[in-house]
Amino acid sequence: MKLLAIISASLALAGFTTATPPPQTFSIKAKGNPKVPSARFDASRSNIFLNYGDSGAVCEVKPGCPKPKDAVFYLKDSILYLYTGSSNPVQKVFLDRSGFGQGKIGYLTGDGQLPSRWEVQGWTIDGAGNLKFKGKGLIACPTSDPKIKSWTVWADLGIATPGGNKGCLPFTAHTMKTKPVACKYT
């Protein structure tokens, strides 16, 4: 009994701490609409895209290993985060369902104050592995530049042309477990 107390006290004095395991990370793919290609989610320039290409993210990968092609996310307390690891500032996904934002989805770096109309809490993954915001799905809108083949991601609020975008289509945002590779997104 005394030996156990001595060991416990020694560990406490030595600053022994247990490492926090990384959160369950996942990538997201667009599925369920034949007009929206089975596309990966990318994060760049504070926006969420489908098939954006090189996002410019700086990732912590082992030498000889490629950086992830998809953005890496995790969910905590119904807030959707980009996985940045412990050495980068937090990056959390927001949604603006106001008349001004019309379902705009993006992400912010840091833990600063959010504008009052932006929401971060309300994300869930259903039993089939599909990501939703307060029970609603997502839509994709093709970019207006014909040279760019990516799509912007919006919340499905029943608005056919959010932000003035045309050709927007609903899809299922399906999550898939992935390795926790820390990246800082631009």
Curated annotation (Swiss-Prot):
GO terms for biological process: sporulation resulting in formation of a cellular spore. Induction: Expression is down-regulated in presence of human keratinocytes. Residues 1-19 form the signal peptide. One of its GO terms (cellular component) is extracellular region. It is found in: Secreted; Secreted, Cell wall. It comes from the Eukaryota. Keywords: Allergen, Cell wall, Secreted, Signal, Sporulation. Cell wall protein involved in development of asexual structures such as phialide and conidium development, and thus required for spore formation. Plays a role as a general stress protectant produced by the fungus in competition with antagonistic bacteria. This is Cell wall protein phiA.
